[in-house]
Swiss-Prot record:
Family membership noted in the UniProt record: Belongs to the helicase family. AddA subfamily.
Annotated gene: addA
Database matches in NCBIfam families: addA_Gpos
Keyword check for Chloroplast: no
Functional description taken from the UniProt entry: The heterodimer acts as both an ATP-dependent DNA helicase and an ATP-dependent, dual-direction single-stranded exonuclease. Recognizes the chi site generating a DNA molecule suitable for the initiation of homologous recombination. The AddA nuclease domain is required for chi fragment generation; this subunit has the helicase and 3' -> 5' nuclease activities.
Name recorded for this polypeptide: ATP-dependent helicase/nuclease subunit A
Cofactor(s) needed by this chain: Mg(2+)
Length: 1252
């Protein structure tokens, strides 16, 4: 199935070998574009006749992971070339230069340009990149200060202290779009507009131009505006859809003479529609033509007329009337004069909005400058300012710096070109020779996979070149189409093509899915007869409601957990069937094998609210699952508890957080306790607690006093401790970290707490400090960035089913792909914002009369709303394409509807059409992926059971789309899905019944005179012992310490001696106060040795120097005071004064607390295991105290704090030799270097013992 390195298609060869032109490679999904890009680069740099050094190529990718993979693949290819031609100096040179290669992300390239030319900017050379946390806080702070200043200026103006019309307009802006509650709407508007404008090469110019569009003069005609042009195009799509509906109505009349009386009305209305379509090229003409729209009453049909056909025609006609009425309402609501007056009112508001964003950016830049930081927007815009200048006409042209960089690169290669934005396009254009006689721009991508418009990616950049570049070989601007897919089976490709050739068009999808765009088979899958499940595409539709009488059409916006569970259960059942009965081609062995869990992925448009439900349901069905979700973190109980504790420490007079803490394991109070506290006198829980603490000396009062004392200590500690260290201090002081580790799901819970600590650590490195600011940051993070996914504790190579968003799946492939949640409505909520933004059309505001408190949408907003809807649905279509094209062997779609009959009638609108494509009007009005998929599939011969749901199913339908794809369409009720679990229970019950009958029969046999041979045979089968039963007792993982501990023990009883799981450490808050044990003192010494700054240590240093470092460790919460006091500093000093200590200080590289894992045969660890266990491996893990390099060899050092005397010295050395030898073995495996010496250092005696 894999494409061989030399077995390129003709199109791939052209993409690899074409030179001396600007080349656009349109690469379909699975067409091997990365392999082509790598081969092109390798051929350029290893050309013996005309080689180009790799550091003279600029390769731009859009993620760091992609850049790393590209560099690695190119490096491997160079090595392969060198093996073929080991004496080539050209190839040798390229291998040496690979480290200097410019294979980078666009942001990394921009950062390099900034660093090399910072003198051209007003930028501190010691600038740093601001952390995301810091940037969010700084933006919010800047905008809040700006708003405060505007309010203050407005107040001064109202009092006549100064005259500032701008501040008055600011208040009007607030009044118009914020209502009476707060100014959050305007705050979000400014922030969103700022982020949006930054994708423009000249944001200030764009902002001012967008506002000036409303500065109309007396000659202004709306019909000549860009808004009218967009409105007309959208209306034309709708009118063509209406025309199709009327033609369908007339066709029904043609087949049914009993409703012939409807024909005259419909033909008149069809003629009226055709006039409107002609007029839709001109706003004024359409305006006049709409005035003539009228629908006369339909003539009566005979009593014996076909009622079904009669209703169908009337419904189609009513749909046309409704749509046309909406268009008339929008267009005829205002004439040009009224629009002009409205724009004059809006102009000062839009101008103020633009100026507000510009002023915000100026202030934000100033704050960043003072802190010496830049953000990701600065990467591109600062780079742009270095590489460009304006000519006399104000046009952007390359600067002298850009021209110098242009000379450096022989070719510029851009991967994932469909995801570029305008700023990136200008940057790369300035340093390329694309407009010269020697063009050198290579661009590869697939516009059908452009799914990052929310990051301001602009697929129009790719499309402009795609539509203008030619395929001719002698063209300066040339394109090559890679249309073969080497990933998927024919069944998958056919089903993808069948859907998209019907729904994707230039108007919706921004590309016509024709023969040039369809996926063509390139993979070579051998047929496999023993598969019990076909490779046909599957569409599973669940009717999620039992009672269809009260269903609202739009209720798919918010799914209940119960409804999501239905899809999860259906998918779970299908996974179980596939695992048992489906075979996949193993990519490593190229041999068919049974499907495993890791072969399966479940893709969702959004994981929020879905992934956790899916995960829980699949786990309940015994299916291991890994959900790569971006939500659920802040809802985790352990995270909520710690955040509540932080809030209480910051301000204890907050009842809800206080109640949460008291009821948690940290507080240890019951619900009954809280009720008792609640009735005590006081305004807040905190006040009540203080009263209760003084009531008496009973157990309840003592517990409260203990809690308040701890709270006091925590509050005091928070004042001078960095937030990350303070959080970890709370984990240990409360014992909460240990507690959550001991309960169900402990590993995940502890990982979530670690994630909170890491977030605090990042925060503490910013210019913001303090507990209050951190809590404020977390609250804003919830509001602005939304939730985060829980900490990841499962690796990506585990044998589990994966759940992920479609966006995260881009670039990946899986043998079996489920696409779920297809019935969920598209998210078009952003179109309801009071002011819309569009790169081409500018602003689309609502008109608001804040004095009368009335508002209505403007035609400018309606135009932008229509345009955004088309662009959003085009993006959604591409997202669906990405989801479908992840599948290699099996594609399964799952969606839910409320009323299956109503949905089928909606999908069947295009069923009688003789057009291959579904009408654009229908595609535009669709509300979900399922609407698109089902309306296409219902036209396929295999969807008979879907058509059977319609009452007209007996009618012969001649317009099914002829297509080679094969489909399996299933329609299930809610009860069908819920019965899956019942079936599983019944199967289990049947097995139990059979076992009961078997044992009953066995008793009869034993009591009868049957031949003893049969009894012995049955007995032997029942008492059968599995040959490898000891494998179940072997551990998967052992520590070196456990090996050492058991080396001298009899290891026959594996489970009891070694593999008894250790209990989770008892939480600190449950432990009694006691002296430190020898092992705890040893841990303290190890911590000191791990964190000592060796670079500041010399052989003649004093105890004072070491004491200072240990005190610093206490301050940083690395050690407790108790641990620090237990450390014998003289012994530490003695170590560094020893010969081995001196070598450590002088070593070129020292590694401390180095963790490792190695695979060891079980028979090597347990000598008495039979040879049949040779293939059973055990992971041995450990931590090496210290090793250092000397002349590319390793010196290993293990140190111990044990009590040693002359009597037990030899025994101690012998005890640890086994352990040290494992360390040696591990280091040689992991580092590839030889361990030349091994030492054991004994702190108690100061002896250094060489281990032979």
């Amino acid at each position: 199935m894999n494409v061989g390195k030399t077995n390129w298609t003709e199109e791939q060869k052209e993409a690899i070998d074409t030179r001396n032109c600007n080349l656009l490679v349109a690469a379909a999904a699975g067409s091997g574009k990365t392999a082509v890009l790598v081969e092109r680069i390798v051929k350029i740099i290893t050309n013996e006749e005309n080689p180009v050094d790799i550091d003279r190529l600029l390769v731009v990718t859009f993620t760091n992971a992609a850049a790393s993979e590209m560099r690695e693949r190119i490096g491997d290819a160079i090595v392969n070339k060198l093996c073929e031609n080991p004496n080539s100096r050209v190839i040798q040179k390229q291998l040496a230069l690979i480290g200097k290669s410019k294979i980078t992300t666009i942001h990394s390239f921009c950062l390099d340009v900034i660093k090399n030319n910072f003198h051209m900017l007003d930028l501190d050379p010691d600038f740093r990149v601001g952390d995301e946390t810091e940037i969010i806080l700084l933006k919010n702070e800047t905008l809040e200060e700006l708003f405060e200043d505007k309010y203050l200026q407005a107040e001064y103006t109202s009092k006549g202290i100064n005259k500032n019309n701008n501040s008055i307009e600011f208040l009007k802006l607030v009044e118009s779009y914020c209502g009476n509650k707060n100014d959050q709407v305007l705050f979000n508007m400014v922030m969103n507009l700022y982020n949006f404008s930054m994708s423009n090469p000249e944001p200030y110019k764009w902002l001012k131009k967008a506002a000036e569009r409303f500065n109309v003069d007396d000659d202004f005609e709306f019909g000549d505006s860009l808004w009218a042009e967009v409105l007309m195009k959208n209306i034309q799509i709708q009118l063509l859809g209406m025309k199709g509906q009327l033609i369908e109505s007339i066709n029904i009349i043609n087949s049914c003479a009993s409703i012939e009386s409807y024909r005259e009305n419909l033909e008149v209305e069809l003629s009226m529609l055709e006039k409107l379509i002609v007029a839709s090229n001109n706003y004024e003409k359409l305006y006049e033509e709409l005035k003539n729209v009228q629908f006369k009453t339909l003539k009566r049909c005979p009593k014996d007329a076909d009622k079904e056909k009669q209703k169908l025609v009337r419904d189609l006609r009513d749909g046309v009337k409704k749509s046309l009425s909406k268009i008339s309402e929008d267009i005829l609501s205002q004439n040009s004069e009224e629009i002009k007056e409205e724009f004059k009112v809006l102009y000062p508001l839009m101008k103020t909005l633009s100026e507000l964003v510009i002023e915000f950016d100026i202030r934000y830049k100033d704050k960043k400058k003072k802190r010496g930081i830049i953000d990701f927007n600065d990467f591109e815009h600062m780079c742009l300012s270095i590489l460009t200048k304006s000519d006399e006409s104000g046009n952007i042209v390359p600067s002298e710096t850009a021209l110098k960089i242009r000379e450096k690169y022989e070719e510029i290669l851009i991967d994932e070109y469909q995801d570029s934005n305008m700023v990136q396009e200008v940057i790369l254009s300035t340093i390329s020779r694309k407009d010269t006689e020697n063009p050198n721009l290579f661009m590869v991508g697939d516009v059908k996979q452009s799914i990052y418009r929310f990051r301001q990616a602009n697929p129009g950049i790719f499309l402009e070149k795609y539509n203008s570049y030619k395929e001719n070989k002698d063209e300066k601007n040339r394109k090559v189409l890679l249309y073969k897919n080497f990933r998927s089976r024919k069944e998958v490709l056919d089903s993808v093509n069948f859907v998209f050739k019907q729904i994707m068009s230039v108007n919706i999808g921004e590309l016509d899915y024709d023969d040039n765009e369809k996926l063509n088979l390139g993979a070579n899958y051998e047929e496999i007869e023993e598969n019990l499940i076909s490779h046909s595409a599957e569409l599973n539709i669940i009717e999620k409601s039992e009672d269809n009488t009260e269903i609202k059409e739009n209720n798919e916006d918010e799914e209940s957990v119960d409804n999501i569970m239905l899809e999860a259960r259906l998918i779970g059942r299908r996974i179980i069937e596939l695992k048992e009965n489906f075979k996949v081609l193993d990519k490593n062995t190229n041999v068919y094998r049974k499907a495993e869990f890791k072969d399966i992925v479940i893709l969702l448009r959004s994981t929020k609210g879905w992934a956790n439900v899916f995960s829980d349901e699949l786990k309940n069905m015994g299916i291991p699952v890994f959900a790569d979700a971006n939500s659920g973190y802040f809802d985790a109980p352990e995270v909520k508890t710690m955040l509540s504790l932080l809030q209480v420490i910051d301000n204890p007079r907050q009842d809800i957080p206080m109640a949460a803490v008291l009821k948690s394991p940290v507080g240890g109070f019951s619900v009954e306790d809280l009720i008792d506290i609640k009735v005590i006198e006081g305004d807040t829980f905190y006040d009540k607690l203080k009263v209760a603490a003084d009531i008496g000396d009973d157990e309840f009062s003592v517990r409260i006093r203990t809690f308040l004392n701890r709270l006091y200590r925590w509050r005091k500690e928070s004042l001078y401790t960095p937030i990350d260290e303070f959080i970890w201090y709370l984990y240990t002081d409360t014992g909460y970290y240990g507690y959550v580790g001991a309960v169900s799901g402990g590993i995940q819970r502890q990982a979530n707490l670690k994630m909170l600590f890491q977030r605090a650590k990042i925060y503490s490195e910013t210019s913001y400090k303090g507990l209050f600011n951190f809590i404020n940051f977390i609250n804003k993070l919830k509001l602005t960035s939304g939730d985060m996914g829980s900490a990841k504790i499962l690796g990506e190579n585990e044998n589990v089913v994966r759940i992920m968003s479609i966006h995260k799946s881009k670039g990946l492939e899986f043998p079996i792909v489920f696409v779920g949640g297809l019935g969920k409505n598209f998210n078009l909520m952003d179109m309801n914002n009071p002011v819309l933004f569009h790169n081409y059309l500018g602003f689309g505001p609502e008109y608001v009369d804040y004095k009368k408190r009335i508002s209505h949408k403007t035609l400018a907003k309606e135009a932008i709303k229509n345009r955004i809807r088309i662009e959003t649905l085009s993006e959604e279509m591409r997202i669906l394409y990405v989801a479908f094209t992840r599948a290699k062997e099996k594609l399964i779609m799952v969606g839910s509807v409320s009323d299956i009959k109503r949905s089928v009638f909606k999908w069947a609108v295009n069923l009688r059409s003789n057009q291959n494509k579904i009408s654009e009007d229908y595609v535009l009005k669709s509300k979900s992926f399922l609407d698109w998929i089902a309306s296409a599939v219902i036209r396929h011969k295999d969807a008979e059971n879907l058509r059977d749901i319609m009452d007209t199913s007996k009618e012969n339908i001649d317009n099914l789309v002829c297509d080679p794809s094969s489909w399996r369409v299933n329609v299930l009720s809610r009860n069908d899905v819920l019965s899956f679990n019942q079936l599983l229970l019944e199967e289990e019950k049947n097995i139990n019944e059979k076992l009961t009958q078997f044992y009953k029969r066995l008793k009869e046999i034993r009591s009868s005179n049957y031949e003893s041979v049969y009894i012995e045979e049955i007995k032997s089968r029942l008492e059968f012992k599995y040959r490898y039963e000891k494998a179940a007792e072997l551990p998967s993982l052992l520590s070196v310490t456990e090996l050492k501990r058991n080396i001298n023990e009899d290891n026959d009883e594996y489970a009891t001696k070694i593999f008894t799981p250790s209990l989770v450490k008892k939480p600190l808050f449950l432990e009694e106060v006691k002296k430190m044990s020898p092992s705890e003192r040893g841990t303290a010494v190890h911590s000191v040795m791990q964190h000592l700054d060796f670079s500041s240590i010399s052989c003649d240093m004093s105890i004072k120097n070491i004491r200072h470092q240990i005190d610093d460790m206490v301050f940083r919460r690395i050690l407790t005071e108790k641990q620090a006091e237990s450390v014998n500093i003289n012994r530490i000093l003695k170590f560094f004064q020893s010969p081995i200590g001196s070598r450590v200080i002088k070593a070129e590289k020292v590694y401390r607390e180095f963790p490792f894992q190695i695979r060891v045969k079980s028979t090597e660890i347990y000598n008495d295991l039979p040879k049949i266990y040779d293939d059973e491996n055990i992971i041995v893990q450990g931590i090496v105290d210290l090793f250092f390099k000397e002349n590319d060899e390793i010196v290993l050092l293990d140190y111990k704090n044990d009590y040693i005397n002359d009597e037990n010295l030899n025994e101690t050395v012998k005890k640890y030799t086994y352990q040290i030898n494992y360390y040696k073995r591990a280091l040689e495996i992991v580092t590839g270097l030889k361990v030349k010496e091994k030492y054991l250092y004994l702190f108690y005696t100061g002896d250094t013992i060489k281990i032979e």
